[in-house]
Amino acid sequence: MSDVQTPFQLLVDIDQRCRRLAAGLPAQQEAVQSWSGIGFRMGGRFFVAPMGEVGEVLHEPRYTQLPGVKTWVKGVANVRGRLLPIMDLCGFLGTELSPLRKQRRVLVVEHLDVFAGLIVDEVFGMQHFPVDTFSEQLPPLEAALQPFIHGVFHREQPWLVFSPHALAQHQGFLDVAV
């Protein structure tokens, strides 16, 4: 007698042959979680601000100086119809701004009632760090800088996590009058 298979038995046979001859899947690589922010430099230090805390990055705009304000308040600029106060972040923190104007950029911060532009020496764009390189153990910092640093990522050099929102809530930053 001939071996007659039912359609179901035929499908089971095909399934078994396919499973025997199928190549295995490639090994799964575990995805490394990363943290992203806007990298910038002030003096010889590297900083990174959380993505949600910087609205945009601008070239240093022309601004009008204001009387009766602290020296780190550079003035006010018209940016697309909005008046943007321009602040020298290095000056606020007690350091010198780089003399190389071409590299300077302005980080625009809008948080609660504060809308301000922070001049920094240089911006490096988006930076990505593996989360396991983060540490809350900070290197020695100036007292003026400490309230705004929330940790450090380690790469070739340390990248300090700078919070523009913490700066925007700091009374010393809000008090601009002489």
Swiss-Prot record:
Domain of life: Bacteria
GO BP terms, alphabetized: chemotaxis; signal transduction
Keyword Calcium applies: no
Keywords: Sensory transduction
GO cellular component term, pick one: cytosol
InterPro entries assigned to the protein according to its UniProt record, in alphabetical order: CheW, CheW-like_dom_sf, CheW-lke_dom
Domain CheW-like: 34-173
Entry keyword annotation includes Cell cycle: no
Any Pfam family the entry gives: CheW
Known function: May be a part of a signal-transduction system that regulates twitching motility by controlling pilus function (extension and retraction).
Name of protein: Protein PilI
Organism of origin: Pseudomonas aeruginosa (strain ATCC 15692 / DSM 22644 / CIP 104116 / JCM 14847 / LMG 12228 / 1C / PRS 101 / PAO1)
Source organism phylogeny: Bacteria, Pseudomonadati, Pseudomonadota, Gammaproteobacteria, Pseudomonadales
